[in-house]
Each structure stands twice: as C-alpha cells, then as structure tokens.
Amino acid sequence: MNPNQKIITIGSVSLTIATICFLMQIAIQVTTVTLHFKQYECDSPANNQVMPCEPIIIERNITEIVYLTNTTIEKEICPKLVEYRNWSKPQCKITGFAPFSKDNSIRLSAGGDIWVTREPYVSCDPGKCYQFALGQGTTLDNKHSNDTIHDRTPHRTLLMNELGVPFHLGTRQVCIGWSSSSCHDGKAWLHVCVTGYDKNATASFIYDGRLVDSIGSWSQNILRTQESECVCINGTCTVVMTDGSASGRADTKILFIEEGKIVHISPLSGSAQHVEECSCYPRYPGVRCICRDNWKGSNRPVVDINVKDYSIDSSYVCSGLVGDTPRNNDRSSNSYCRNPNNEKGNHGVKGWAFDDGNDVWMGRTISEDSRSGYETFKVIGGWSTPNSKLQINRQVIVDSDNRSGYSGIFSVEGKSCINRCFYVELIRGREQETRVWWTSNSIVVFCGTSGTYGTGSWPDGADINLMPI
C-alpha cells in the first residue's frame, strides 16, 4: 500500500469512528431528555401521610445520583412513611439488664475539653439514641467550673449528643435551662427547658428546632420538670411538671403537648402526696411515670396518664423493697400501694421502676442513706401485692464503694416489642470530694435482655487526684 492509500484508509477509519461517536452522543442526549420528562407522581393523601409509589425520574431536592458516561441523571426516591409513634407493641420479656453504653466523661476531662454537667438522661428517635444533660456553661478544666454544685444558674443549657459521645466543645446546646425533658414524637424532637428566677421561671417548648410555646411559674417556687424523657403517643406528648415546695405540698400538673403547643393541662389527682422528677414510659394507650416523693415517702409515687381524655390517677409502688434514698433497711421498710410510707420521706433521689405483669423491675442505690452504689432487681408481686418483698434477678451496676446519683428510664421500640433501658448518673466532685471545686458526672447505660449475663461493676472510674482542681 502506497503512502496515499494509507492516508486515505486512516482518514476513512477516523471519519467512521467520529460519525459513530457523534450518533452515540445524540442517542444519549435523546435518552436523557426523554427520561427527564417521564414522570409518575406520588399520591399524597391527607393526614400528612405518603403512600408507596413507583420511582420517578425528575429533578427534585431529594436525589440519588446515577452516573451514565458523562451524563448525570437525578432519580427521586419516594419519601419514607413518616408517622407519629404509638408505642402499641407489647413490652419485651426480659431476664435482666445488659451493658449498653458508657461515656467516661470525667476520665476524659482530665486531658480534654469536656462540659461540666449534671441531670443526664437518654432518649431515642425512631432510628438512633441520644444522651442529654444540663451543662453548667463551662468545661471542667476551666475556672468557671468552681462552685458548679449549684443547680440553677442562667448559664445552664440542655446539651444533646449521640449516645456514647461525651459532651465536647462541639456539642449542640438545644435550649436554655436548669431543668428539662425531651422526647421524639416520630416526626421531630420536643424539648422542654425551664430557666429564670426561682420565683418566676419560664418553661420553653421547642419543637423541630423552633420555639412554639411557653408557660410561666404557677406557684412561684422553682418550676421544674422530669430530668428524663417525656413520652409521645399518636402525636400527643405528656410532660409532668411541679411548682412548689420541695419538702411540703406542691402543685403538680401534667401538660399535654402537640407539635410543641400546649393543648391541655391536667392537675395531679389520686393518692400521691408529692411528685417530682418523674421517669416516664409508654404503657399503651397511656403513659406511666415513677417519680420521687421528696416530702413523705421513700416508696415511689406512680402517675398514670390517660392521653385520650387527659385524666390522671396516682398511687405508690406496692413493693415493700422501696426505691428512694434515704430509706429504711429492707426488713423494716413498707409500702401499701396507695399512700406514702412516712419513712425517711424528706429528701430523695430521682429513680425508676416499671411494671411487668404483677411484678416490678426497679433500680436503686445500694446505700440506704447516700447516693452510693447501684443495683437492679425484680420484686415478685411488687406491682400488685402490698408490701411484697420477694426479690429475684439482682444485679450490681455500680459497687457500693463508688458514687452513683440520679437514674431514669427510656424506652426503645424493636421489631416486635418495646424494650426498657435505664441510665445511672455517676456524680463526681463536690460535696464529697473536696479536693476539687467542681461537680460533674458521667453516665452508664443498660438495657433489658432476654439472654444470659454476667457480673461486674461500672463506676465512673476517674482518679480524683489526676483531675483539674
């Protein structure tokens, strides 16, 4: 083949390839335009529900990127069904509790910037669990941490992180408050935060990141709320709030909240004499709370909330092995279901329990007089039989040589049942540990299990001599 023939052959092949490429580009563009105009809209009926639909090819904000050569096609994914939580599944059957999470905040504070906190709790949205606490407006290794034993200052804010993530400097402060409660209704978070002067405080109701409602003090004596999660059923969230004496008659109200708006307020009724710091859980179709009687009883009050008609009843846990601190020893303690036992009732600590048929699961400090150690157990007949004392399935969570503090319940919905979990506040610093000037905490978290489990102790674990003063 002479040079001219080679040139002609190469040119012909190049022209053919170019033509093929050109035609392919035209085909791709035609396909892309066709796909962009091929739409099958989702049906969106009333009640804010989204029905299942076929995938649609259309440019929208919610997109999944699919690459085809050099062309980008944006494919919409139909939104998932978003519903209010109703908590209608049965309670899980458990044999005890297994370790779930520990944040080690105090140990980490020895060498890092970690918030000073107290009054922690845990709550979950439908997909993830979060830990909350009331911050003191300072990190531990900071002179502002001096004298943080005080409960109520204007600098306190509600902190929120994923469970297991200590409250570092990047932690979100969701509202201002020295008392709080939070819960997720299936669509968004509700936060209730109380702040202001003791005699004229304000509770702010923040829903989906926006301030929706508020209420002022009704008894001018330290308006306060649960210090653990509230509960939402079919879009109605219940929050127990108290205003009045911490060691005498107080005025407790149950607030019903829908998307952050107060829709009803019910006064406490029933036989409970004093109710504070309730640990609440869904008991479909209502809500049940186990609280703190800081006046007359070391047996814990029970508050039953009817979400449909706003009615309230109250009583006391029947178990003769009582849950508050201080308390009588187990041989001499009593509870007869309806009234406070008048045994070391003045003072107390936030705690929890939950019913299991006629029985009751509960947690409490191991010490009868101080916030030291922590144990859980089941009392046979403890929900229905006055002064029942048969204890089974006891577990030590924190040994008696180490400090504990507040504790509370939270609920987690599984595929077939609702599990009960609890957290324990592990307080460190003042008043007991006077080498330092701060007061703060870490937490440990356990959840119900139907399996087997071992033994151990999970204290805070920080060496106070290694901590900043």
From Swiss-Prot:
Q: Where is this region: Head of neuraminidase?
A: 91-469
Region entry Hypervariable stalk region: which residue ranges? Answer: 36-88
Keyword Thylakoid attributed? no
Q: Which cofactor does it need?
A: Ca(2+)
Residues spanning the signal sequence: none
* Function statement: Catalyzes the removal of terminal sialic acid residues from viral and cellular glycoconjugates. Cleaves off the terminal sialic acids on the glycosylated HA during virus budding to facilitate virus release. Additionally helps virus spread through the circulation by further removing sialic acids from the cell surface. These cleavages prevent self-aggregation and ensure the efficient spread of the progeny virus from cell to cell. Otherwise, infection would be limited to one round of replication.
GO cellular component annotations of the record = host cell plasma membrane; membrane; virion membrane
Q: List the disulfide bonds.
A: 92-417, 124-129, 183-230, 232-237, 278-291, 280-289, 318-337, 421-447
- What name has this protein been given in UniProt? Neuraminidase
Please state the gene responsible for encoding this protein: NA
Show which residues sit on the Intravirion side of the membrane: 1-6
Which parts of the sequence are annotated with region: Involved in apical transport and lipid raft association? 11-33
- Tell me the Gene Ontology biological-process terms attached to this UniProt entry: carbohydrate metabolic process; viral budding from plasma membrane
Query: Can you name one GO molecular function term for this protein?
Result: metal ion binding
* Subunit structure of this chain's protein: Homotetramer.
Activity modulation comment: Inhibited by the neuraminidase inhibitors zanamivir (Relenza) and oseltamivir (Tamiflu). These drugs interfere with the release of progeny virus from infected cells and are effective against all influenza strains. Resistance to neuraminidase inhibitors is quite rare.
Question: Where is this chain's protein located in or outside the cell?
Answer: Virion membrane; Host apical cell membrane
Q: Respond yes or no to whether keyword Lyase is given for this record.
A: no
Record organism: Influenza A virus (strain A/Udorn/1972 H3N2)
Task: Write down the glycosylated positions.
Answer: 61, 70, 86, 146, 200, 234, 402
The UniProt record's further free-text remark is: The influenza A genome consist of 8 RNA segments. Genetic variation of hemagglutinin and/or neuraminidase genes results in the emergence of new influenza strains. The mechanism of variation can be the result of point mutations or the result of genetic reassortment between segments of two different strains.
Modification after translation is described as: N-glycosylated.
